Design a protein with these regions (language model features):
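Active-site substrate-recognition segment that forms the wall
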Residues: 43-46, 51, 55-95, 180, ...
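Conserved Rossmann-like nucleotide-cofactor binding loop
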Residues: 11, 34, 261
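Predominantly flavin-linked oxidoreductase catalytic cores and closely associated redox partners
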Residues: 151, 155-184, 191-277
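Gly/Ala-rich phosphate-binding loop of Rossmann-like dinucleotide-binding domains
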Residues: 16, 20-21, 210
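Beta1/beta-strand and adjacent pyrophosphate-binding region of the FAD-binding site
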Residues: 1-11
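Glycine-rich Rossmann-fold phosphate-binding loop(s) that bind the pyrophosphate
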Residues: 7-9, 31, 258
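Rossmann-like flavin
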Residues: 86-209
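Glycine-rich FAD pyrophosphate-binding loop
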Residues: 20-41
Length: 354
């Protein structure tokens, strides 16, 4: 069967890998020049089953209201005359009940556990390297109320098989000595030894190389403009290729893996995908003093930031990512939000990054 994968990010390339392994003829199409150049480019790099509590939870509505208008808020809604944003927002609110939150935690833990297991098997099968670390993920809290609020979800995750252990501030510093600078502010922490971290962009690029060697075709620099139907089925993809020429491509099956842009292609087909773009921010810093930089991947729950450390032949670097801005497809960077991330890094690990 000929399969066309739309999108060369982490999900698109991974789908292409497994489809090729099953014997299909696979073509991947993406508008960027290289795989993994958008959502997968510089994210937080955590493989975090322990991060299973959804944004939509009982405490979220009040927090969102408090954060409205705060440029450096962890979650910033910029209200727009955009029906898709309002529909997504209403769905978000419907999922903030205790019952929905418990259900969604169950679903996320199940999916996350399966995904982590699949990644580990893929690593064994291919030997792929992507600056991965298997030292777990530590969630730390500097607000006692935030810490108390995390205990219930952590217990539910343990009951579901995710070993997210509640630990003291002293135990947190023992696991990650770089937190000693903020020991007086630590209210507590949780630690999941089975969780991992790694460079998502490097993973995608390395897996794409394996796919190409196995016969997967990549058509990069191609702008997908529409999915056309005939007889109630997708008949072909319309695109403008890297040379600016119009093309039609036909397959027996199609994988839509374009992240927040997927709804724009699906909507003309009468398919409404409940997906809305969230703009995240990240900073990557070379490690200046290895003794001051963290080793374990961290989550700062109060500021909604994650921290990963990557080690390669070119040296160590810190990836700090997080916060979310819901502002449609706007790609402009807000300097206030960028500075807030850098400021938090300096508070937690002064002198660690350059």
């Amino acid at each position: 069967m000929r399969v066309i994968v739309l999108g060369a990010g982490l999900l698109g390339v991974t789908s292409a890998y497994y489809l090729q392994q099953q014997g299909h003829e696979v073509t991947v199409i993406d508008r960027q020049a290289t795989p993994g150049a958008e959502t997968s480019f510089a994210n937080g790099g955590q493989i975090s089953v322990s991060h299973a509590e959804p944004w939509a939870n009982p405490s979220a509505p009040l927090k969102v209201l408090q954060w409205l208008g705060q440029e450096d808020a962890p979650l910033l809604f910029r209200l727009r005359a955009d029906m898709r944003q309002w529909l997504w927002g209403l769905s978000f609110l419907r999922n903030c009940t205790p019952e929905r939150t418990r259900h969604n935690i169950r679903q996320i833990v199940s999916l996350g556990t399966y995904s982590r297991s699949a990644l580990q098997q893929l690593r064994r099968d291919t030997g792929i390297q992507y600056d991965q670390r298997t030292q777990g993920i530590l969630h730390f809290y500097t607000d006692p109320k935030e810490f108390d609020g995390a205990l219930g979800p952590a217990e539910q995750m343990r009951q579901l098989g995710c070993e997210r252990q509640v630990i003291s501030a002293d135990e947190a510093v023992r696991i990650e000595p770089a937190l000693r600078h903020i020991r007086p502010q630590l209210a507590g922490a949780t630690y999941t030894a089975e969780d991992e971290s790694g460079d998502a962009n490097l993973f995608v690029r390395e897996l794409a190389k394996l796919c190409e060697r196995a016969g997967v075709r990549f058509q990069m620099g191609a702008h997908i403009t529409a999915l056309r139907t005939a007889g109630g089925e997708i008949d072909h993809v319309e695109l403008t290729n890297a040379e600016g020429r119009f093309e039609r491509m036909r397959g027996d099956a199609y994988v839509l893996a374009m992240g927040s842009f997927s709804p724009l292609l699906a909507q003309p087909l009468g398919i409404r995908l409940p997906i809305y773009p969230a703009k995240g921010y990240s900073v990557t810093l070379p490690v200046k003093d290895a003794r001051l930089a963290h080793q374990v991947s961290l989550t700062d729950d109060e500021y909604k930031l994650v921290f990963s450390r990557y080690t390669s032949a070119q040296g160590d670097r810190l990836r700090i990512a997080g916060t979310a801005e819901l502002n449609g497809y706007d790609r402009n960077l807000n300097q206030v939000r960028c500075e807030a991330i850098v400021r938090r890094v300096e508070q937690l690990f002064p002198g660690a990054g350059d």
